[in-house]
């Protein structure tokens, strides 16, 4: 089901599996697993989502179930990969952009992990989207999310709510 990052595709003969990487950050061992999995299952239709997740298309049900298990063993989650509990989106150059006041990665990870831990207990609106921006690349579009954080030169964040266009 969609809550677990699995969706039937048109015609219901195949499905799609969506993989969640915490704030879009893929670890080296996960990249190795990803490369091995692409070869093992001959995955040919793969793309990144705007929520910094990865989607695999054209899969049969048995493959989706097997990938669900294998992903979990490698710290890749299908739950929280979209739908009502999407991934927290963060600047793609965080931690390496020399213009950053500081690395926002720990903040992005903490928000994402908190939401993953609490998704069964807190009631946030459907399709609630969050973003955290390093203040320079605007890739997470934090100012247009339901809740966004934009790093300032003062070591603070401007907070945007409800898809606002100003601090």
Positions of PLM-derived features:
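A structural signal for small-residue-enriched, beta-sheet-centric alpha/beta enzyme cores
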Residues: 156-167
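Intrinsically disordered, low-complexity polar/charged tails and linkers
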Residues: 1-7
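Gly-rich Lys/Arg/Thr-decorated short loops/hinges at beta-loop-alpha junctions or inter-strand turns
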Residues: 10-18, 165-167
